[in-house]
């Protein structure tokens, strides 16, 4: 425990009164004791598993609740936030009045008043000059444990000087009974006020609301300073060469950035400033459904004492059944980043990225396994954020489902997507970085591109072999595709060659091109977006 602590007067400034005790920056050992107290009930209670990690349940909320997300619309945010009720793009940034904010704040502070509270002071962002100093206040021990795992843990010296830039008050036990009259989505809420620099949580116990809440705030603050804010993983090679991997769920972002030859900077949220790429977090929040030691040894071995499992099935003898998704498919574990051996130390940051990789899993069988992108194509495909999944595993015809998520993370964008694309490309151009589109999905044979071929493609990108390769231009999408790469099956590089009849590829390509164009239409309401249409597929 730190010597400084926090006084009841400081909590009173936030509207929290008559606190019975403040547990400030508890140690992992104290949190372990607190979470496993036999007197705890319901979702507060943690269960010790044979892995050494504690398991908790989050009730009906086993994922984020985007429909309950609000941002106060005021003089600061009016003209900067990408609002849900403006423009053609759909997003989760619903406006909230100052009046309703005050009501919600009253509900949360009333819930936390008179209680024994956990207060955890953390950093969000590994760079001292741009990081947020975030103070989390909760009455639930495991929620304090979650943020201790996921955010950067200050030293005692840093805690002595700690002045919070942002306050998160988690009132998971309280709900808003007046939601209907106020025109809100439900009794639950995740609300932000950028003038007060505060987040309020009510009704949902899901830990990820605290993690992604601060990501949304970094996504607001950093691009306005010219710093890229990215939903990506990042690693660094022995020579200091940095690569960043963007991709939606299921595209291989975590798997492909975990490489024995390279050190991990982080697995999910990063910034890119004048010094280079830096992690926002001090931990990892990994999916655990169907987790096995063989497939993902790093994550498997990170699940030990101090890790926190969410919504997994724990058997009577304390063992965890990672294959059981009966509570949710979104089972998770949070752990401090040092539970992974091969990481950048002591601070999760490195130099400028020279390789930017967009991962997509194309179930339409159209895109090549890899292509080099021009600067405009980089912005176009970044804004499109495309992936697709097969609708089912039954035999016979399966209709692929396309997903377009701006900047490979639309749910967390607080500004218009074109602002992120512009900042990213400026950062790339300043250091001569190159972007590549890597398809980890399916080809005309109906088979998924093998992990062996994909790893060889990533190796060719990272060691520069791909830049020496002769290329051809794939029609419609106008992509520069290498004719051969070391260790990669040459028969798969041109997706047209994986079809018995090339006319089949042409038909599917035209269909997918139309879907890209329809999706991109929402960006044409800004000059920056309209200028990029020509970088997309030609129908």
Swiss-Prot record:
**Localization terms from the record:** Cytoplasm
Q: Where does ATP bind?
A: 212, 231, 247-255, 296, 332, 448-449, 454
Which GO biological process categories is it annotated with? gluconeogenesis
The record's listing under Gene3D superfamilies reads: 3.90.228.20, Phosphoenolpyruvate Carboxykinase, domain 1 (3.40.449.10), Phosphoenolpyruvate Carboxykinase, domain 2 (2.170.8.10)
> Cross-referenced CDD domains, in alphabetical order?
PEPCK_ATP (cd00484)
What InterPro entries does this protein's entry cite?
PEP_carboxykinase_ATP, PEP_carboxykinase_C, PEP_carboxykinase_N, PEPCK_ATP_CS
Supply the alphabetized keyword list.
Answer: ATP-binding, Cytoplasm, Decarboxylase, Gluconeogenesis, Lyase, Manganese, Metal-binding, Nucleotide-binding
Cofactor note text = Binds 1 Mn(2+) ion per subunit.
Q: May I have one GO cellular component term?
A: cytosol
Give the EC class as a word. lyase
E.C. no: 4.1.1.49
- Cofactor(s), by name: Mn(2+)
Write out the residues that bind substrate. 64, 206, 212, 332
| HAMAP family linked to this entry | PEPCK_ATP (MF_00453)
Tell me which family the UniProt entry assigns to this protein. Answer: Belongs to the phosphoenolpyruvate carboxykinase (ATP) family.
| Binding partners and assembly | Monomer.
What is the protein's known function? Involved in the gluconeogenesis. Catalyzes the conversion of oxaloacetate (OAA) to phosphoenolpyruvate (PEP) through direct phosphoryl transfer between the nucleoside triphosphate and OAA.
Q: What is this protein called?
A: Phosphoenolpyruvate carboxykinase (ATP)
């Amino acid at each position: 425990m730190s010597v400084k602590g926090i006084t009841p007067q400081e909590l009173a400034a936030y509207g929290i009164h008559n606190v019975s005790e403040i547990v400030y920056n508890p140690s992992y050992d104290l949190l372990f004791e607190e979470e496993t107290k036999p007197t705890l009930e319901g979702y507060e209670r943690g269960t010790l598993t044979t892995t050494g990690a504690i398991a908790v349940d989050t009730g009906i909320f086993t994922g984020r609740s985007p429909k309950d997300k609000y941002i106060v619309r005021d003089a600061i945010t009016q003209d900067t936030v990408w609002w849900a009720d403006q423009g053609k793009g759909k997003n989760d940034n619903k406006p909230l009045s100052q009046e309703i904010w005050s009501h919600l704040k009253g509900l949360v502070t009333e819930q936390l008043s008179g209680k024994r509270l956990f207060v955890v002071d953390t950093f969000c962002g590994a760079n001292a000059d741009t990081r947020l100093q975030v103070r989390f206040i909760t009455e639930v021990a495991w929620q304090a444990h979650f943020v201790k795992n996921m955010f950067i843990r200050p030293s005692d010296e840093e805690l002595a000087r700690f002045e919070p830039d942002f306050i998160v008050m988690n009132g998971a036990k309280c709900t808003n009974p007046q939601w209907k009259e106020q025109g809100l989505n439900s009794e639950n809420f995740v609300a932000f006020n950028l003038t007060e620099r505060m987040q309020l949580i009510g009704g949902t116990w899901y830990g990820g609301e605290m993690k992604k809440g601060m990501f949304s705030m970094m996504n607001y603050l950093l691009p306005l300073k010219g710093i890229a804010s990215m939903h990506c993983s990042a690693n660094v090679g022995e020579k200091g060469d940095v690569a960043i991997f963007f991709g939606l769920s299921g595209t291989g972002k975590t798997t492909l950035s975990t490489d024995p030859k390279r050190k991990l900077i982080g697995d999910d949220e990063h910034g890119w400033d004048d010094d280079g790429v830096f992690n926002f977090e001090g931990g990892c929040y990994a999916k655990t459904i169907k987790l096995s030691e063989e497939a993902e040894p790093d994550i498997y071995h990170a699940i030990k004492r101090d890790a926190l499992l969410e919504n997994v099935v724990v058997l009577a003898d304390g063992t965890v059944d990672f294959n059981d998704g009966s509570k949710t498919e979104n089972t998770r574990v949070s752990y401090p980043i040092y539970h992974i051996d091969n990481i950048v130390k002591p601070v999760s940051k490195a130099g400028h990225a020279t390789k930017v990789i967009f991962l997509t899993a194309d179930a339409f069988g159209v895109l090549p396994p890899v292509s080099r992108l021009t600067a405009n194509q980089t912005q176009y495909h970044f804004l499109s954020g495309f992936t697709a999944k097969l609708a089912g595993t039954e035999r016979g015809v399966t209709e692929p489902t396309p997903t377009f998520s701006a900047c490979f993370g639309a749910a967390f964008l607080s500004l218009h997507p074109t602002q992120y694309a512009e900042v990213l490309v400026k950062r790339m151009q300043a250091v001569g970085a190159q972007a590549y589109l890597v398809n980890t999905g399916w080809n005309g044979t109906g088979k998924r591109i093998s992990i062996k071929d994909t790893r060889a493609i990533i190796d060719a990108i990272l060691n520069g072999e791909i830049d020496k390769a002769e290329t051809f231009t794939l029609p419609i999408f106008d992509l520069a595709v290498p004719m051969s790469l070391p260790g990669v099956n040459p028969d798969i590089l041109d997706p047209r060659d994986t079809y018995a009849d090339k006319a089949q590829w042409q038909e599917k390509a035209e269909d997918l091109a139309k879907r890209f164009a329809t999706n991109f239409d929402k960006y044409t309401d800004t000059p920056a977006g309209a200028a990029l249409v020509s970088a997309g597929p030609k129908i």
